């Protein structure tokens, strides 16, 4: 049976690079949030500096995810699916903005629970160096990234079982490691959790 794997972590941790490499290794469909659909494009405009109420942005993310989940379900009929960000990003980032967890959970009730979540950790200063060449989004400030990092660990260590992945979480620290080293570490950890994932 095909698996749904999600990559999460703060900005600059190496999620996109590693998610693409793992997707390629597993012959999986690579996908991401926000998506490149109409709603996802609106979200990207807001993240780049357009003004919007935080609850409106949360609802847009949830709406984009409804479309995303439909596509994920279709793709899972044919192959594994690897996503760069998913509902956990919404939970962490939106709670950091002061939105209630109950509100976030309610509007994301439609979200499919993944089989496995890979959380990439990184030293904050190294993450900022990696992001220097990028256009800054509203969440890419060191104080916010520190809060986001704490949020991920709080979520993993909480008693809350909502959206708890079937095979749990894998945590890999990417600080001072090469792309190849991180890839090997992630792949070995995935195989440990799901031995039959590579046929």
From Swiss-Prot:
Q: Does the keyword Zinc apply?
A: no
GO MF assignments: ATP binding; dTMP kinase activity
Annotated positions binding ATP: 9-16
Query: For this chain's UniProt record, which GO biological process terms are given?
Result: dTDP biosynthetic process; dTTP biosynthetic process; dUDP biosynthetic process
User: Could you tell me the superkingdom of the organism this chain comes from?
Assistant: Archaea
Reaction(s) the record says it catalyses: dTMP + ATP = dTDP + ADP
Annotated InterPro entries: P-loop_NTPase, Thymidylate_kin-like_dom, Thymidylate_kinase
- Alphabetical keyword list: ATP-binding, Kinase, Nucleotide biosynthesis, Nucleotide-binding, Transferase
> Could you tell me the EC number(s) of this protein?
2.7.4.9
One GO CC annotation, please?
cytoplasm
CDD domains, alphabetized: TMPK
Gene3D superfamilies membership = P-loop containing nucleotide triphosphate hydrolases
Q: Family membership, please give it.
A: Belongs to the thymidylate kinase family.
Name used for this protein in its record: Probable thymidylate kinase
Q: Which species is this UniProt entry from?
A: Methanococcus maripaludis (strain C5 / ATCC BAA-1333)
Name of the gene this protein is made from: tmk
